[in-house]
Swiss-Prot record:
Transit peptide region: 1-25, 1-35
Residues recorded with modification N6-succinyllysine: 102, 107, 362, 405
Family indicated by similarity: Belongs to the class-III pyridoxal-phosphate-dependent aminotransferase family.
Disease: Hyperornithinemia with gyrate atrophy of choroid and retina: A disorder clinically characterized by a triad of progressive chorioretinal degeneration, early cataract formation, and type II muscle fiber atrophy. Characteristic chorioretinal atrophy with progressive constriction of the visual fields leads to blindness at the latest during the sixth decade of life. Patients generally have normal intelligence.
Protein name: Ornithine aminotransferase, mitochondrial
Primary localization class, coarse: mitochondrion
CC terms in the record's Gene Ontology section: cytoplasm; mitochondrial matrix; mitochondrion; nucleoplasm
Organism, scientific name: Homo sapiens (Human)
Phylogenetic classification of the source organism: Eukaryota, Metazoa, Chordata, Craniata, Vertebrata
Length: 439
């Protein structure tokens, strides 16, 4: 009987497939006597042995990235069609962002918020003017931004709306994903996220996504302080709501004095072809959450944007983070935002996203049953059979030189860095087409 480690090693070797561009360069005997850099199999084995088993990565071991490309430890080159879940919208290791990090890292990296630093205010002024909000609360990760929004909503509910203390409720849409802390999974409808981790956060209600009548019923409760929603549900499989949904959300929240919280951590920052996905319907949320591409993938940076009547309900000592607003993260975030502006990446995402979806819709319907998305946040739904499923498609895409990852079993997300050019996109489409037709 195989041990778990032996089983993993066997799985990794089999699932990596045969790369036609790479022949076995050394014999088994040579490998035993010659020390060299770790192989992909070495890396799979080491992670399995020493790391927690809380992820199921596609078996590819990466060591370098530039722009839209990644290279593994054997030197194979790939198109990146995940963009680290839309964290590298500006492309891997964008020189402007890298140089900003390098210029700051030798000066000052962390002061905590016990003292002022000379970069935070510059960043705060830039991002608030860019998105037209009074204030920003800087954090590090996306889930921290979500937690911050929930605290703001509750505090606002008590101090402004007049909800009885500790009775405030926040409404979420089914299928949401904003992290894996206890608060985040308390709002989740995905058993993989929440099963076995209760008891859960009280005061969280869940309604169907893209369902305005359900939202209207939920907001009849005077204890509801906020509705938090993704303009497009990313982790759920790039679920795009009906036209007018976000306008309806804005109208209902205004009517019932409820905060509209837009989770733009994956959809924002040019990914969908607009600076924010809510811009498609010209609505202004009360609170906006940003993260991921806010640093271009170089450093964890997130942000919560809102106006004074909400932000100033939190007083000194009531919320914060040792690393939130540190000068290194702020300098990186300024550069990352400037790249999005200077290179017109929202416009590029809009234009190329239309091309991508038009081509994906030509794929055979007996394999691909749906195509959806906006800008360069897209997904296909794979019809699973005994011969293929989304995981097998992603393995073959990898073998053909393109990296993507399944979500929720039968869905593959296609989200390349926004710096991709049309000829590169069309080359990628050829790989996708070739792969799908091979099943």
């Amino acid at each position: 009987m195989f041990s778990k480690l032996a089983h993993l090693q066997r799985f990794a070797v089999l699932s990596r497939g045969v790369h036609s561009s790479v022949a076995s360069a050394t014999s088994v005997a040579t490998k035993k006597t010659v020390q060299g850099p770790p192989t992909s199999d070495d890396i799979f084995e080491r992670e399995y042995k020493y790391g927690a088993h809380n992820y199921h990565p596609l078996p590819v071991a990466l060591e370098r990235g530039k722009g839209i490309y990644l290279w593994d430890v054997e030197g194979r080159k790939y198109f990146d069609f995940l963009s680290s879940y839309s964290a590298v919208n500006q492309g891997h290791c964008h020189p402007k962002i890298v140089n900003a990090l390098k210029s700051q890292v030798d000066k000052l990296t962390l002061t905590s918020r016990a003292f002022y630093n000379n970069v935070l205010g510059e960043y705060e002024e830039y991002i608030t003017k860019l998105f037209n909000y009074h204030k920003v609360l800087p954090m590090n990760t996306g889930v921290e931004a979500g937690e911050t929004a929930c605290k703001l909503a509750r505090k606002w509910g008590y101090t402004v709306k007049g909800i009885q203390k500790y009775k405030a409720k926040i409404v979420f849409a089914a299928g949401n994903f904003w992290g894996r802390t206890l608060s985040a999974i308390s709002s989740s409808t995905d058993p993989t996220s929440y099963d076995g981790f209760g008891p859960f956060m009280p005061g969280f209600d869940i309604i169907p996504y893209n369902d305005l009548p359900a939202l209207e019923r939920a907001l009849q409760d005077p204890n509801v302080a906020a509705f938090m929603v993704e303009p497009i549900q990313g982790e759920a499989g790039v679920v795009v709501p009906d036209p007018g949904y976000l306008m309806g959300v804005r109208e209902l929240c205004t009517r019932h004095q409820v905060l509209f919280i837009a989770d733009e951590i994956q959809t924002g920052l040019a990914r969908t072809g607009r600076w924010l996905a809510v811009d498609y319907e010209n609505v202004r949320p009360d609170i906006v959450l940003l993260g991921k591409a806010l640093s271009g993938g170089l450093y964890p940076v997130s942000a919560v944007l809102c106006d004074d009547d909400i932000m100033l309900t939190i007083k000194p000592g009531e919320h914060g983070s040792t690393y939130g607003g540190n000068p290194l993260g702020c300098r990186v975030a300024i550069a990352a935002l400037e790249v999005l502006e200077e290179e017109n990446l929202a416009e590029n995402a809009d234009k190329l996203g239309i091309i991508l979806r038009n081509e994906l819709m030509k794929l055979p319907s007996d394999v691909v049953t749906a195509v959806r998305g906006k800008g360069l946040l897209n997904a296909i739904v794979i019809k699973e059979t005994k011969d293929w499923d989304a995981w097998k498609v992603c393995l073959r895409l990898r073998d053909n030189g393109l990296l993507a990852k399944p979500t929720h079993g039968d869905i593959i997300r296609f989200a390349p860095p926004l710096v991709i050019k049309e000829d590169e996109l069309r080359e990628s489409i050829e790989i996708i087409n070739k792969t799908i037709l091979s099943f």
